[in-house]
Amino acid sequence: MKFNFNETEDAPDSRRSPTPKEPVRWVPLQSHPVFASLPSSQDEPAVSQLFPRNFMAWDGDSRVYYWDSRRYLLHRLSLRLGEPEPSSVLAAVPSKVMQPDLQVTFSVSKISINKSGSAVLLAGSDGICVMYLFGRASVIEDNVICRVVSIGSEIYTSSDSAITLLQASWHPDSDTHLGILSSDAVFRLFDLSSDTELPEQEYYLQPGEPGRSRTASSIYPADFSFGGDHLWDRFTVFILFTDGSIYILCPVVPFGSVYKWESVMEIYNDANMYGVKSSNSLAVSNSSLAIEWLEATFPDLTEQGTRGENILVVKAQPYALLDASLALQGPLYKASSGDGDEDFAVREAECKGRAVSLLYNLVSKDSILVTAWSAGQLQVDALVDEIQPVWISGNSSRLRMNSHNKIQGVAMICESNISELPVATSNLPLDHTVWLGHPPPLLRLAMVDLALPKMREGGSLVTLFADSLLPERIYSLHDGGIDSTVLHSLPFTSQASGKDEALKTPSVHTVLSTCQEESAVSPLLGFVPLSDSFGYSWIVAVLSSGECIVAEMKTWDLLLPIHVSTDKTVSSSAIEKKEQENSCIISKELLAGPKIRIAPHALPNQRSTPANSVEGRSILLDYVKLFHENYIEYAHKVHFELQHHAPNLKRIIDDQHQRLAEANEKISKVEKNQSFLEKRIDKAIERHDSLEQCLQRLRSLPGTHKKPLTRAELDFKSELDQYAGVEVDALQSSIETLRARVKKSTQKSHKGTVVAASQKKQYSKKNLIQDTQMSQLQSTLAKLSLMNSDNSKKVKIVESALKSQESSFM
């Protein structure tokens, strides 16, 4: 279902199709002039990058969008995938240029397109807006002027606000809903079809137990990801915090979004079957709340008998529980251990830096969560159990109603429910854990180290993408380039296919290396994966130097890991056997000759027979027949074999000559480079000697004889490094957010006092208060202020006298 919320009246220019002046021609995408016109990377200021940068987006069909950050223009490139060759990508020249009708006042770092391709999200750390690609538009100098709407300007782009955007994404089940996570630890869901300034849903995140926060990074969010099309996952938002902990918000449903009837009915029947009929009162309570929410959000569940069975999709209605709020489930613990502190220690030992990115990926029957760290590690986990909604009773939600008493907005505080639950372990049966409110445990699939170079203090910003054609493949976009990680085995998918194998190590390949050394800004401006219906896949990357890279990604047999044999004896013998088979031109039987003997062995007492006798002639005839039957036929076979193997022999000889020529050429190259190599070896030896001398001088310094740090000192040093690298940023952001809130509250209180004073003045006028009384009050206030200032001066004099006396006594 598509929602059209653009204005129906079209401008006169919008009826004209903005055709370019020059005819359309098709060129390879990497040779498109749009990328060649990019400014040089040397002109870009070396500013710290706080928001993941990606100026490219794909609508899933045949259009790629690119944002020009210098000219504030959006380019739309029409593509032909797989033409004229299956592995080629062509783009139309010239491209369609789209210009915002309003000036974008913030720096755009990321663009994203909704699933219908009707709107593009322009997001940055200081603001966010949406550009509508169709509807009311005009044409100026071949540029299509598109309508731009700011999102939450009072919250994100106001001059008084210190709130920064951390992540923004379209909801996968709605074309008009945006999810935004900000530095004030609030997740907001905006509905562009109703209101772009006020959020439709607000969730104030309160992770951990109140008053027992471990570090500042444990309460500072980093990223979020929507769930996929699987049971309650489709109603789930996964929140990542900078310490690596993952929390769950469920259920979160955009008002008016559409879902499949079968999907909603499946979780509805599950709640009725396993929750309500449980012997545990807590499971009955949780499942009853879930059933109540489902029946109110999707009224078709209760009206199924009256409306018939021909229901394909259902529409979500605005609803929220009045006396309960969503629980912030988590942090998700590892399935091998139920102790949260132990799991946190293990995670800190494996990963370094801070968590920067989160990706939810649904692969067949497995829900995969990939966490990226600033030091370059990827943490790949799978959900062991199904997600179920949890509410905390007593925390009422705040509703915003319209004139028809319908819900327009919901706001609630989401606290962690970990203190109310017993410690959950993975060895409990299903009947003891279902619908009890336990967050689903995580199964560690792999830890991948991308070995990123350390180029800046805060670490690298790693952005994760899933391949639309092969969900087992995950792309990692970072300062050093692009890497591809392929998962070869998944727990539930392998179990469903009948494979009972151990988890295999994922394969990691470098797709693109930017050879970064000391630059503070990544040269990658945009990245997008492409795919078509014939099974071909590509990646497109744009560099700040104006270079566009298009690479075809193999998909067939990619999930089969390469097996490398370590038995050198077998491999060498196989090679020798193959060489012997290739060198065999004539069969060994022909080389051995005929096996039949013509002349039999003569007995010692046998008489000789004369040749001219009858017996001698008969013996000679028999010898001639045997000779013809054996040697003549053998000669024919040899002749046939020689004729048959002549081309093969010629090919082998030519191959040997070619190899000989190549060997001679290599030998000549080596002879030419021998002097150069000798010079390099001499320089290396000299460098080695100088380094040894420097090492000897360093060893003689007094600081080298100091004792090494103890284990406790090393632990304390690592804590200080962690605090300097992660905690300071989180504390600084929290302080700025609190200052903004205090400033906003003081402004509101000042406005309230002004309004109250004006109301009081009007009321006094109505009661005919005389001006003399007002003047008396003013004079009294002036006297009081003078007395207050005099008293403060006297207090300062007394304090100075006391300090002087104390100093004299000491």
From Swiss-Prot:
* Superkingdom as given in the UniProt entry: Eukaryota
Q: Does the keyword Translocase apply?
A: no
Give coiled-coil spans as residue ranges.
Answer: 646-748
Where it mainly occurs, coarsely classed, is: nucleus
Q: What GO terms describe the biological role, i.e. biological process, of this protein?
A: innate immune response; mRNA transport; protein export from nucleus; ribosomal large subunit export from nucleus; ribosomal small subunit export from nucleus; systemic acquired resistance
Q: Where are the transmembrane segments?
A: none
Query: Where is the segment annotated Disordered?
Result: 1-23
MF (Gene Ontology): structural constituent of nuclear pore
Q: List the disulfide bonds.
A: none
* Protein's cellular compartments: Nucleus envelope; Nucleus, Nuclear pore complex
Q: What happens when the gene is disrupted?
A: Lethal.
What are the record keywords, sorted? Coiled coil, mRNA transport, Nuclear pore complex, Nucleus, Protein transport, Translocation, Transport
- Look up the record and report any one GO term of the cellular component aspect: nuclear pore
Record keyword Metal-binding present: no
Signal peptide boundaries:
none
Question: Partners and quaternary state?
Answer: Part of the nuclear pore complex (NPC). The NPC has an eight-fold symmetrical structure comprising a central transport channel and two rings, the cytoplasmic and nuclear rings, to which eight filaments are attached. The cytoplasmic filaments have loose ends, while the nuclear filaments are joined in a distal ring, forming a nuclear basket. NPCs are highly dynamic in configuration and composition, and can be devided in 3 subcomplexes, the NUP62 subcomplex, the NUP107-160 subcomplex and the NUP93 subcomplex, containing approximately 30 different nucleoporin proteins.
> What is the protein's known function?
Involved in the regulation of exportin-mediated nuclear protein export. Required for resistance mediated by multiple R proteins and for the appropriate nuclear accumulation of SNC1 and of the downstream defense signaling components EDS1 and NPR1. Not involved in salt tolerance, ethylene and auxin responses, but required for systemic acquired resistance.
Task: State what protein this is by name.
Answer: Nuclear pore complex protein NUP88
**What organism is this sequence from?**
Arabidopsis thaliana
| Organism ancestry | Eukaryota, Viridiplantae, Streptophyta, Embryophyta, Tracheophyta
